[in-house]
């Protein structure tokens, strides 16, 4: 049993096993704080995340359980995986107040990476293909990410990609009513509350990311909810009757039905000078009607990416179905703590292929 050490990091007291050495603070936010650590006696570096207030409220405790369960389930080279999870020694559930996650250390997120250099078309293709591989794997588990954006995609110097941040993820059939994620990458069915959200919302986000990678600018850059709608319609045109009839809120339907008619922009004109196959794939990802939108698996077979496919990818990109029945459970914090504690106790680092 390793000893725990206490280290003051960014005005917070961290407690972690002495097998790790603190290197430097990487950043943080409402989700938690992240530090770079080294496995003692080696040159192996990892990212250690200290969750912020993991058990403050019932929804926080449930979110902590969700994040651990999802990360434990994922085992793919293009998706962040859980390498270790622990909490400082606690004699009882009242003392159990902190949770730490250890994951792969990546050099930068895609937002910073894409702005630090001029990316070639080949590099864009390689990065996009890896995003789609990871997304296909996530979707095969029956999970929708819901918050794909450049800062939730990590990249190493060798263009290796991993999808991050499953804090908002849900099963496909979940009927969500909140607007999650950054507005600029939200699918129109989220903005207009159109029925049940499916895997298609993530594909829309990847289409927005592709547009940003090839042009170096955000495609739908709204300043607020109303301007986001205008940005969307200015490029995509007035939603069709097929799209509008699927909207559950009468107010949203009436708003769109009364909106001045506008034709969809010609993508080949809008993106003139860029790779025509990239534009064609982007159009298929940015289809307003989600039922007609290309899937991650189909996008990987598109001519823009087809030559990157390897025979073994199909098996590697398929995950076991993820059991998320707990999402329907309403429990007090104490019970969620016990479930989290059980997940931590039963985690075995060697259950993952750590040599990706």
From Swiss-Prot:
GO molecular function ontology, one term from the record: MAP kinase activity
GO biological process: intracellular signal transduction; p38MAPK cascade; regulation of adult chitin-containing cuticle pigmentation; regulation of lipid storage; regulation of response to oxidative stress; response to bacterium
Modified residues (Phosphothreonine): 177
Annotated binding of ATP, by residue: 26-34, 49
Cofactor dependence: Mg(2+)
SUPFAM superfamilies: Protein kinase-like (PK-like) (SSF56112)
Protein kinase domain location: 20-305
GO cellular component terms, semicolon-separated: cytoplasm; nucleus
Active site: 147 (proton acceptor)
Alphabetized InterPro entries for the sequence: Kinase-like_dom_sf, MAP_kinase, MAP_kinase_CS, Prot_kinase_dom, Protein_kinase_ATP_BS
Entry keywords, A to Z: ATP-binding, Kinase, Nucleotide-binding, Phosphoprotein, Serine/threonine-protein kinase, Transferase
Post-translational modification: The phosphorylation on Thr-177 activates the enzyme. A conserved Tyr, which must also be phosphorylated to activate the enzyme in closely related sequences, is replaced by His-179 in this sequence.
Organism superkingdom: Eukaryota
Catalytic activity: L-seryl-[protein] + ATP = O-phospho-L-seryl-[protein] + ADP + H(+); L-threonyl-[protein] + ATP = O-phospho-L-threonyl-[protein] + ADP + H(+)
One Pfam assignment: Pkinase
Signal peptide: none
Gene3D superfamilies registered for this protein in UniProt: Phosphorylase Kinase, domain 1 (3.30.200.20), Transferase(Phosphotransferase) domain 1 (1.10.510.10)
Catalytic activity, EC: 2.7.11.24
Function description: Kinase involved in a signal transduction pathway.
Family: Belongs to the protein kinase superfamily. CMGC Ser/Thr protein kinase family. MAP kinase subfamily.
PANTHER family: MITOGEN-ACTIVATED PROTEIN KINASE
Protein name in the entry: Putative mitogen-activated protein kinase 14C
Species of provenance: Drosophila melanogaster
Organism phylogeny: Eukaryota, Metazoa, Ecdysozoa, Arthropoda, Hexapoda
Name of the coding gene: p38c
